[in-house]
Amino acid sequence: MTILFLTMVISYFGCMKAAPMKEVNVHGQGNLAYPGVRTHGTLESVNGPRAGSRGLTTTSLADTFEHVIEELLDEDQKVRPNEENHKDADLYTSRVMLSSQVPLEPPLLFLLEEYKNYLDAANMSMRVRRHSDPARRGELSVCDSISEWVTAADKKTAVDMSGGTVTVLEKVPVSKGQLKQYFYETKCNPMGYTKEGCRGIDKRHWNSQCRTTQSYVRALTMDSKKRIGWRFIRIDTSCVCTLTIKRGR
């Protein structure tokens, strides 16, 4: 399974032909170099010239990805906005990717989370694993959601952290040309079975509704004064159930 997972990750990086860009501080919005979140390029761009060679071992590859994830998590802590002022939104830098083509897989951190869940399940006994399988227990999501990669051409505008409307730029200039901005969005499924209310809620006592919520990610944008820079914008990242109690019964 480890080899299969690493193969998936190699394919994930291989389909992204993005050039590495210089990192800058979050406050340096005038610089077009992408801060914090890295582009997904070849293995050579991630870990030097030797990382892309065919002689790369499984151990060194795993160390490479572990190092990348640690840097992403460290950067996430550095640029996280004041949580007291933004309690209604989180920061998901892993949902943004710069690429020359549509990504074929979910964000890398999502794949790592699935892999972690597999390892946890592998440590269970057969009986415990069988009974912990959501499909066997008949578990269903409270709200049906869909996730997909979208481009700035789909979004066009977004709301930044100050509440202003900014234009999301479709392409980002790099040393060897331009790359498109892709955003991994999750929202409530309008064609799902929960469009009339949350699943499993007692309708005699509660009013329920599945609602799409948003989080902050960083993207290259242009404000109303034509100033281009990296800003935090809101994108759809989850589908949650909201409840209100029925009164007058």
Curated annotation (Swiss-Prot):
Mature BDNF is produced by proteolytic removal of the propeptide, catalyzed by a FURIN family member. In addition, the precursor form is proteolytically cleaved within the propeptide, but this is not an obligatory intermediate for the production of mature BDNF. Can be converted into mature BDNF by plasmin (PLG). The record marks T59, S60 as: Cleavage. It is found in: Secreted. Expressed in the dorsal root ganglion and the spinal cord (at protein level). Detected in brain, especially in brain cortex, hippocampus, midbrain and cerebellum. Induction: Expression oscillates in a circadian manner in the suprachiasmatic nucleus (SCN) of the brain. Expressed at higher levels during the dark period and at lower levels during the light period. Up-regulated after sciatic nerve injury. The keyword Lyase does not apply. The keyword Protein biosynthesis does not apply. Keywords: Cleavage on pair of basic residues, Disulfide bond, Glycoprotein, Growth factor, Secreted, Signal. Glycans are attached at N123. GO terms for cellular component: axon; cytoplasm; cytoplasmic vesicle; dendrite; endoplasmic reticulum lumen; extracellular region; extracellular space; glutamatergic synapse. GO terms for molecular function: growth factor activity; neurotrophin TRKB receptor binding. Disruption phenotype: Mutant mice are smaller than wild-type littermates, and most die during the second week after birth. They exhibit impaired motor coordination and balance, head bobbing and tilting, and spinning during perionds of hyperactivity. Mutant mice display a strongly reduced number of neurons in the dorsal root ganglion, trigeminal ganglion, mesencephalic trigeminal nucleus, vestibular ganglion and nodose ganglion. Cell death of vestibular ganglion neurons is strongly increased 14 days after birth. The number of facial motor neurons and sympathetic superior cervical ganglion neurons are not decreased. Changing R130K: Forms homodimers processed at L-112 that seem more stable than the wild-type. Disulfide bonds join C143-C210, C188-C239, C198-C241. One of its GO terms (biological process) is negative regulation of programmed cell death. InterPro entries: Brain-der_neurotrophic_factor, Cystine-knot_cytokine, Nerve_growth_factor-like, Nerve_growth_factor-rel, Nerve_growth_factor_CS. Residues 19-130 form a propeptide. Residues 1-18 form the signal peptide. Important signaling molecule that activates signaling cascades downstream of NTRK2. During development, promotes the survival and differentiation of selected neuronal populations of the peripheral and central nervous systems. Participates in axonal growth, pathfinding and in the modulation of dendritic growth and morphology. Major regulator of synaptic transmission and plasticity at adult synapses in many regions of the CNS. Monomers and homodimers. Binds to NTRK2/TRKB. Can form heterodimers with other neurotrophin family members, such as NTF3 and NTF4 (in vitro), but the physiological relevance of this is not clear. BDNF precursor form: interacts with the heterodimer formed by NGFR and SORCS2. Mature BDNF has much lower affinity for the heterodimer formed by NGFR and SORCS2. Belongs to the NGF-beta family. This is Neurotrophic factor BDNF precursor form. It comes from Mus musculus.
